């Protein structure tokens, strides 16, 4: 077995424990203001912001370092219109026929329905895909390891980066999402993971009155 090629770890800024604690708390506090938004402003967002946030997403760890994420950033109004039409068709079917009563009850508190105007109003949509398998230049298939987990981590970094840039987001998951491959011309080895709506919140934006779990409800320490 050959030894992997290695390079020195890039240097990091030295910090005291107090500085680390302060940074960690400030970051947690900033993310504490993050909310999913459904009322967006059409105000433009420079492509450079989206590019930088996608670069951050691309730093995520991945199974066997295969980096199975694929992102399609969409600002074209006609493409957004087609996505909205297809998504709303699936959502109407979901709300009227496929969704179990328990799921609909859980969604009721969020005020969601089959109408998705934000898919056209928001300046950017980012379609997130994961590779089910890789395909080399000769057309041979190659297994992807932990693609769901890898793309989930990358998407979390993307959402955090967009929030840090002062933007609002919404994770949208119409079911099924196969129409995204057709509308966006993606190959069959890529599966839609979610659709991220990105932009500035509308001036009159309101969000559901919900509370997050306290730390002790979801984390434990063994010291």
Predicted regions and their residues:
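Glycine/small-residue-rich phosphate/adenosyl-binding loop
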Residues: 67-151
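N-terminal accessory segments that position/regulate proteins before the catalytic core
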Residues: 1-37, 41-52, 93, 97
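Short, electropositive alpha-helical surface patch
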Residues: 180-193
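Small-aliphatic-rich amphipathic alpha-helix that forms the alpha element of a beta-alpha
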Residues: 55-57, 126, 132-183
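C-terminal helix-cap and adjacent tail motif
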Residues: 2-23, 113, 191-223
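Short alpha-helical scaffolding segments that buttress acidic/His motifs in well-ordered protein cores
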Residues: 31, 53-57, 196
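Glycine-rich, charged/polar anion/phosphate-binding loops
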Residues: 56-58, 109-114, 180-182, 205
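Glycine-rich phosphate/pyrophosphate-binding beta-alpha loops
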Residues: 58-65
């Amino acid at each position: 077995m050959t030894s992997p090629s290695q390079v020195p770890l890039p240097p990091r800024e030295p910090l005291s424990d107090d500085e680390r604690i302060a940074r960690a708390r400030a970051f947690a506090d900033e993310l504490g203001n993050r909310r999913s938004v459904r009322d967006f402003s059409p105000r433009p967002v420079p492509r450079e912001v989206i590019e930088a946030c996608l670069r951050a997403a691309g730093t995520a760890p991945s199974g066997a370092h295969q980096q199975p994420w694929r992102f399609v950033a969409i600002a074209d109004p006609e493409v957004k219109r087609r996505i909205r039409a297809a998504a709303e068709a699936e959502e109407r079917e979901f709300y009227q026929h496929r969704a179990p009563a328990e799921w609909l009850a859980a969604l009721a508190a969020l005020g969601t329905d089959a109408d998705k105007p934000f898919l056209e109003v928001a300046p950017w949509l980012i379609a997130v895909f994961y590779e089910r398998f890789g395909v080399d230049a000769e057309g041979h298939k190659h297994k992807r390891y932990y693609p769901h987990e890898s793309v989930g981590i990358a998407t979390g970094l993307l959402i955090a980066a967009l929030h840090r840039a002062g933007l609002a987001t919404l994770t949208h998951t119409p079911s099924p999402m196969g129409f995204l491959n057709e509308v966006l011309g993606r190959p069959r080895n890529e599966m839609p993971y979610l659709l991220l709506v990105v932009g500035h919140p509308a001036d009159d934006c309101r969000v559901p009155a919900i509370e997050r779990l306290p730390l002790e409800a979801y984390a434990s320490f063994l010291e």
